[in-house]
Every structure is written in structure tokens, then in C-alpha cells.
Design a protein with these regions (language model features):
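All-alpha helical catalytic cores of prenyl diphosphate-utilizing isoprenoid enzymes
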Residues: 1-16, 26-33, 37-39, 54-161, ...
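Post-signal peptide N-terminal segment of secreted/secretory-pathway proteins
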Residues: 21-23
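Active-site/pore-lining binding-face segments in mid-to-C-terminal subdomains
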Residues: 135-209
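C-terminal structured domains
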Residues: 165, 171, 194-198, 202, ...
Length: 251
């Protein structure tokens, strides 16, 4: 799992943000951020593998998350506020069991909350950052994170079709078919790409220019991945009663 977390951090440019943290605090901070991400992944795994969720089990996962946040110096009240978007993400996942699909929501809204774990990491790093050296805030990463989350859905489409997962691309394929699903994802990718360019078009800030450059790179990578995986699905259509849809069809 540590390797998976390190790959996530690399992909989301977490090492770049950590470079603005005082060197003496960096190793300790990274260790605890990895543990926090592990705690969240364990919660996520429970949500993806168990249809009937138990409050006591959920409480156990949240106790681990809060314990790690305590090690990072946050009070229970601060931890509750920091993790509000993780709880919203959990709500979206649990609502699948009530047939409340994420396709009913704005794609920007849904993917924003889906990026809760990475935004939590950014918020914590920000609290340890020398603000005199770094001139961006968390909101500057918005479109980078939105495109990255779409990339994650497309990348994981084959494994997510057999789990209880709120992969929006997978859900759209089941609801409207592959061609329309691909079209909708491509459209929203373009919207996020254009919004990112509009936000930074006139900036001369080096940190923001980096974010714009990375967002652009990830946009083109994701468009290509969408083309590639859509072709693979076209050649071998999904089982319409696998994973999430197995439970929905028998519920």
C-alpha cells in the first residue's frame, strides 16, 4: 500500500508542495501523511467491498483517521472540520446503496468531493509551509485535481466495474451507454481544461504557471486514456450485473 500512496503523491505533485516545508519537519510530516492516506484507503476499501455497512466498523476506521490527525497536531474539533469533505465523499459512496447515483449530481461537484483525500493532504501541508516561499493556495489546484480524478476513474474503469464503487465513468456507461458516457466525460474534461487556462492566462506567478502546465499535460494524457480505454470496452463490453450492479439487481 505504501507504494500505491507514493505513486498517488507523485502524481498529485505532493513532493512539490513538500519542498516548501522546513527540511527538519519534512520526514516526520511525510510519514504521518502516508499513514493518514493509508487510513483513508482502508475506509475506502470497506466501502467498496461491503454492501451492508456497519456503524461500528465505520467508527473504527474514523478512529484511526482521527488518531493520525491528532499526531499531526489537530484537536478533535479541527479534525472534524478538516475531514468534512471526506465524510461527504463517504455519503456519496453509501448513497449508492439507496440507488442515488452520482450521475444525478454536477460532475464538477462530484469530482470535487472525490478529491477529498488529496485536498486534505494539501491543507495539512499548507499548515506546515513557509508561506513566504510559496505563493499559491489550495484553490489554485482545483482544475488540476478535477482532471486528475477523472483520469483516476478512466484508469481504474476495469477494476472498478467489479467493486461497489462510485466510478462515474462506469456508472454512466451502464446508464447511457459507452458512446454517450465517453462524450460526457470528454466534454467535462474540456470544460475543466478551458477553466484552468482562463484562470491562469494572464498570471506571471511561477507556482501558478506550474499548476497550469501540469493541468494541461494531465488533460491531454486523460483524453488519450479515454480514447484508449473506450476502445478496449467497445471490443469487450462490460457485464451489466457485475460489482455495484450485481447488488442493485438483486436488492
Amino acid at each position: 500500500m505504501k507504494e500505491k500512496i507514493q505513486e498517488l503523491f507523485e502524481y498529485r505533485k505532493i513532493p512539490y508542495l513538500l519542498s516548501f516545508v522546513k527540511k527538519k519537519e519534512r520526514k516526520w510530516l511525510v510519514k504521518n501523511l502516508i499513514q493518514l492516506q493509508k487510513d483513508i484507503y482502508e475506509l475506502d476499501s470497506y466501502l467498496e467491498t461491503k454492501w451492508n455497512l456497519k456503524t461500528k466498523k465505520l467508527d473504527k476506521y474514523w478512529s484511526k483517521i482521527n488518531r493520525t490527525l491528532s499526531k499531526l497536531g489537530y484537536s478533535p474539533e479541527e479534525s472534524y472540520k478538516l475531514t468534512s469533505h471526506v465524510r461527504k465523499y463517504q455519503l456519496h459512496e453509501t448513497q449508492l446503496r439507496e440507488r442515488k447515483m452520482p450521475s444525478r449530481l454536477s460532475k464538477e461537484y462530484y469530482y470535487y468531493y472525490k478529491s477529498c483525500d488529496v485536498r486534505l493532504t494539501r491543507a495539512i501541508i499548507s499548515d506546515y509551509t513557509d508561506n513566504g516561499k510559496y505563493s499559491c493556495d489550495i484553490t489554485d489546484w482545483r482544475f488540476f485535481d478535477l482532471i486528475s480524478e477523472i483520469n483516476d476513474d478512466i484508469e481504474d474503469i476495469f477494476e472498478d466495474q467489479v467493486t461497489i464503487n462510485g466510478n462515474l465513468f462506469n456508472i454512466l456507461i451502464h446508464e447511457v451507454g459507452l458512446e454517450e458516457a465517453s462524450k460526457q466525460i470528454y466534454t467535462v474534461l474540456n470544460e475543466f481544461y478551458d477553466a484552468s487556462n482562463d484562470r491562469y492566462r494572464m498570471t506571471k506567478n511561477g507556482d501558478k504557471l506550474n499548476i497550469m502546465k501540469w493541468t494541461s499535460e494531465y488533460y491531454f494524457d486523460t483524453v488519450e486514456l479515454l480514447r484508449k480505454n473506450s476502445k478496449a470496452i467497445r471490443n469487450k463490453p462490460f457485464d451489466d450485473k457485475a460489482g455495484l450492479y450485481h447488488y442493485l439487481s438483486s436488492d
